[in-house]
């Protein structure tokens, strides 16, 4: 308390801080040397406290005694170490600006201040007592600690749950892998048995057929030898000059027996395969059918799984001459992912497209707003043929010029054949419709879902074919094609279109604008 009173007596009345280089006026009042000179420059030479004029010609003199006292006060008296004062403020802490004890906390500047700061720099700031500010901060820290502990408890619980789920996934994956391995082992074993049995049956049938062929060959050789001997004997008789001998021996000459028909060999491919051919076809169909394999997602997702090779065009045991002639210009095509509507999902190396209810997201600038997709290849010259398999009716097949609109312009759900720059065939449940320039021609329906498209740019013909159960032309467009043509398709929700490929056929690898000749 005495030290605080002493500091108040040693405070300059102008700056309210401890004297700095103290000087004494003739009236007896003391001030900082710099403070009094600044005061006189602004207010005239007079004492700031008693207003006594300062005589002209007099000089300010430094108060040596007061300066010594200030040095002792600033150094501070030596204190004996006492008990730990606890977590309160350090009583020796002083304001770095004014050298006075820190008594308040300035919330505006976020620091401890002295009494001088409160009447000068922090006069308009929000202030609080040190103990009150400490209580407030302690409450905030305790609340933060409680929230942190709750988060730690929650994180530990989530970590335990995550470990539990990971363990369950590992166990489930092991069980599934074991089950799948067992099923595939049984399937492979059954296939191996069927394979061995089928090969053995074919080998037995081949051995029997070849043995029959050898018997027939031996019979024919014996007959050939008898015929040769008979011919040789006839030539000998013809050279006989004695008429009596000729007549007698010619009567004794016996011709060889009749040859008889060739016995058909007991070999029938259909009989050898039997039900195995149908079984293998159904099995391959189940394995290659989209979504039938174990673990396939119920709905399409954005991931890109490893795809199996695309389907090949079905080759019947006997191909009609018309279709075999069309195959001479066969083209292996792929769908263009950029043009696909946002509800279309491509698979099998872009050979198959499916219309799903779930959207892949917003479409790109080159995608159709309508339920359509086009191929990645286009044609400007030459003769081209391709085949498409539809899962059901309500699909449209066609070709178009590059300027086919991507957006919906009218009431129709597609724009294939609705204008002058496209030609299309709409496959409905009970009929067909050939569309061009907004006009449609109704045609009888077809039962098969395998269709062919033949484009002859030189003659200006676009012909659609039905390939099941037999090959027959459906409709032919005649036009003067003067721009590149791109195959384009429309399909209803739930429908699937597959571009069939032929081994050895031309497979254009260029971009969409590539011109094939």
From Swiss-Prot:
A zinc finger (B box-type) spans 90-137. PANTHER family: B-BOX DOMAIN CONTAINING (PTHR25465), E3 UBIQUITIN-PROTEIN LIGASE TRIM65 (PTHR25465:SF14). One of its GO terms (molecular function) is zinc ion binding. It comes from Homo sapiens (Human). PROSITE patterns: B302_SPRY, ZF_BBOX, ZF_RING_1, ZF_RING_2. This is E3 ubiquitin-protein ligase TRIM65. It is an enzyme of class 2 (transferase). GO terms for cellular component: cytoplasm; cytosol; nucleoplasm. E3 ubiquitin ligase that plays a role in several processes including innate immnity, autophagy or inflammation. Negatively regulates miRNAs by modulating the ubiquitination and stability of TNRC6A, a protein involved in RNA-mediated gene silencing by both micro-RNAs (miRNAs) and short interfering RNAs. This ubiquitination results in the suppressed expression of miR-138-5p leading to increased autophagy. Upon enteroviral infection, promotes 'Lys-63'-mediated ubiquitination activation of IFIH1/MDA5 leading to innate signaling cascade.
